[in-house]
Amino acid sequence: MAKQQDVRPIIKLRSTAGTGYTYVTRKNRRNNPDRLVLKKYDPVVRKHVDFREER
């Protein structure tokens, strides 16, 4: 069973281009308490765009 407040939860990164494309990753809550923003490739628009953490 997973702990209630897991240190490394699984999060979804949703594209800011509005395509609905998502990546799934893990993050360390102690080192990064704020929402994560990564620049990754969105194959729908065929560009690198910002992906923001979705809660």
UniProtKB/Swiss-Prot annotation:
Record keywords: Ribosomal protein included? yes
Q: Please give the superkingdom of this protein's source.
A: Bacteria
Q: Which Pfam families match?
A: Ribosomal_L33 (PF00471)
The family database entries (SUPFAM superfamilies) matched by this protein are listed as: Zn-binding ribosomal proteins
Any one GO molecular function term: structural constituent of ribosome
GO CC entries: cytosolic large ribosomal subunit
> InterPro entries from the entry?
Ribosomal_bL33, Ribosomal_bL33_CS, Ribosomal_bL33_sf, Ribosomal_zn-bd
| One GO BP annotation of this record | translation
Asked whether the UniProt record includes Flavoprotein among its keywords, one would answer no
**What keywords are assigned to this protein?**
Ribonucleoprotein, Ribosomal protein
**Recorded family membership:** Belongs to the bacterial ribosomal protein bL33 family.
| Family annotation (PANTHER family) | 54S RIBOSOMAL PROTEIN L39, MITOCHONDRIAL, LARGE RIBOSOMAL SUBUNIT PROTEIN BL33M
Write the protein's name: Large ribosomal subunit protein bL33
- Name the gene that codes for it: rpmG
